[in-house]
Each structure stands twice: as structure tokens, then as C-alpha cells.
Amino acid sequence: YRYDWARDPDAGMPLAVVRPTSTEQVQTVLRWASAHLVPVVPRGAGTGLSGGATAVDGGIVLSTEKMREITVDPVTRTAVAQPGLLNVEVKKAVAAHGLWYPPDPSSYEICSIGGNIATNAGGLCCVKYGVTTDYVLGMQVVLADGTAVRLGGPRLKDVAGLSLTKLFVGSEGTLGVVTEVTLRLLPPQPTTATVVATFESVEAATSSVVAITGKIRPSMLEFMDAVAINAV
């Protein structure tokens, strides 16, 4: 629990690792930490490559891995999920109801929804379908002093006041710990076809992308140069 996939050599030795299962338990941890001035590092699945879940000396690593409940509402096309679920687990849970959760970071089989929210993760589908923030309708989050607040809700149209929900998506766990999220879902992805093309130069490839996206919006676009292809 000292490291995420960044393997920071300067990672500290935490005072403790806690693995809560509920919002109330997260509140208890953060209240104690706030009262004793102990730093807290929220942690999802630890698959990040930027060191966001790296432990600090004398701090607490708060892992959400045990928070794994999900409820799907096919009528409103929403899901209420805890942050410890993996992205792929959310996809499977909603697919059982004939629905689809589009964000698909390359680590979708091993990364958590909580981590996706913390980093505003995208994926290849973001070209057409957007990134995590486009699918977060609301959340419950515990602030540094242990206060639990609800932001947003299950409605697409929610324009009363400032959009604090958007503020927390991509905040890397610096503003609070997300303990529950309401996700917007879509009908199943339509049948797709894959096209592979080669180009003599980067300029030719980018010009083709501009021409293609001027007529249609592909669900995915991926560019690989010779170095990347040879590495694969």
C-alpha cells in the first residue's frame, strides 16, 4: 500500500492502512485524522502511473477496495456505485440490464471507479462518448473534517447553483473521499466496424483525421507511429 504503479522510490511508510466499507467508516477515519493532524492518502486500485496514491510517512492510506456495492436502475438509466468497484465490474453489472457505461481507460479491467473519478479518466471511446465527468450525475463525498455531503443527483437537468460535482471529478482525492457515485448510463453500443489505414507521414494522418471527423464522429481513434508499432 506504499506505492501505486508509479513505484515512487520516495514513498513513505504510513502509520496505518484502513479499508472502510461505508461512508460512516470513512467519516470516522477522517475525523480522527483531522483532529490529530494526520495526513490521509485516498487509494483506489493503485493502478495510477502518476504517484497519486503514494503513501506519506506517518500518514493513513485510506483504501476504498472494500466498498463494492452497486445498484442499477434500468428505468432512469443510472447506477449508484461505491468507489471500490472496478471499471469492468461496473460495465458488466449494467450490461446485465441492457445498458452501457462508456468510459474505458486502457486499465479498465483493473482500475477502480473511484480512481476514474479522481483522475477524470477517459479512454479510446472519449472521442465520441466523452470522459468520466460526462457520466457522473452526483456523488456522496466525505470532506477532510469528516463531513459527508451529497452533490448532484439522478437528474440530467440539475442547474441550481454551482456545479460542485464537476469540481470533485479530477481532483485526485485532494478535496475529499468519494464514497458513492451516481452514474449516467447509455443504451448498448451499436455494432461497430474497424478500419486500419497507413500513412506516409504524421501530417497525412492528421489531415485524414480532420477529414473523417468533419463528416462523422468515430467512437474511437488511435494513432500509432513506427516507434510504437515496433514496440508492440
Language model features with spans:
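N-terminal flexible segment immediately upstream of the FAD-binding catalytic core
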Residues: 1-31, 35, 48-77, 106, ...
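Pocket-edge structural micro-motifs
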Residues: 20, 42, 64, 83, ...
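Glycine-rich beta-strand-to-loop/alpha-helix junction loops that act as flexible
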Residues: 43-47
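FAD-binding subdomain of flavoenzyme oxidoreductases
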Residues: 69-224
